[in-house]
Amino acid sequence: MRIKELDGLRGIAVLAVILYHYFPWLPITGSAYGWLGVDLFFVLSGFLITSILLGLREQEHYFTIFYSRRILRIFPPYYLALAVYILVCAVLGRLGGFGLWSPYLFYYTSLYVHDPMQVHGVMQYPPLAVVHGLGVLWSLSVEEIYYTVWAPIVRFMKEKMFAATLIAMIIAAPSLRWMWYYPGHLEYFTFYCRMDALAYGSAVALLIHHRRVSPVAWAGRDRFFDWLAVAVIPIAAVFFLIAGGSPDNHYVETVGVLLADLSFALVIYAAIRRSGGNQLWVRLLRARWLRSVGMVSYSLYLFHFPLLVVSHDLVGKLHLPRRVDALGVDLLGLVLSFAVAYGLWYGMESRILRWKDRKVPSPAHA
């Protein structure tokens, strides 16, 4: 069963990322925190994937069903975005060497930092350089690696063991971020340092799984998680107000991200429990426009940054005043991004998803 409130959270996540990438020049304090939208995506993905795997756990064709459905969901838009962007770069004579874009082709960008500009903290790239436009794909590498390693763990490990694995991941990732901290985002892009967000989402899936089995016994535990959310979310908000929104901060990358991911997990848990409820925040998550953005969030995330780079190149040829140029780049990028995302959804994604559900049925929609 599709949970509408989670579509709303996906919409918030992708809008936060777009705000961060498109409008850093606006005097809007919240735009500095938009990078946390990626963490919200990670927690949501951890929940979704683990929920699916728990539903498939006793299926004879567990791996075939899971991986085939994931491939049909993830690969078509991903490789279309990759192909179109590389083609544009080739036409403009800015393709670069195979080593620059091959990590995106094979999903291993988050296993190591392949771009020396990231290692040295230089995040300004030449317009339409391949690495720049494809930079956002690192997060999909993190998720794909998690899908690959987590499915066997859920299938073969006893529940206590994979719960212990989640705890180990939640402890290990911030520890690695602390030890590996470098202003060039070395710790920001790697799977090993970001796996805790996915683990938080997986923990929520495990809690929901047990809650459905014995809802009466979980009444007291639900109250505990409500009080935990009341405590943690304000602490996280105060922390970020004091520490600032930049990820180029040792304490933000460790303590801040930990608090943010835990807050997102608690919000997701509460949203699932209260799905369909009349609380104001729950109704806001069900807003039709926000769920619509959440529906196309995958393609919107894939294309928004490459199209921003393309818009920068096109508008830059007009030699407009700086502020007008920045606004023109952002508006053109936004229009193109939403047009492409909705076009892909209705023209390709939704059709593939319907075909997937017919050909590779699953107890839980993937």
Residue ranges and their predicted role:
Residues M1-L6, I12-W35, I49-I65, L87-G99, ...:
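Alpha-helical transmembrane segments in multi-pass integral membrane proteins
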Residues D7, F66, L137-S141, Y147, ...:
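Short alpha-helical catalytic segment bearing the HExxH-like zincin motif
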Residues D39-F42, D196:
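His/acidic/aromatic-lined binding-pocket segments of jelly-roll/cupin-type domains
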Residues S68-A81, V154:
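Alpha-helical transmembrane segments of multi-pass membrane proteins
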Residues I74, V119-A172, T190-L198, A205-H209:
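Hydrophobic alpha-helical segments with transmembrane-like composition
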Residues L80-V88:
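Hydrophobic alpha-helical transmembrane segments that constitute the membrane-spanning cores
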Residues P103-Y108:
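Short helix- or helix-capping micro-motifs
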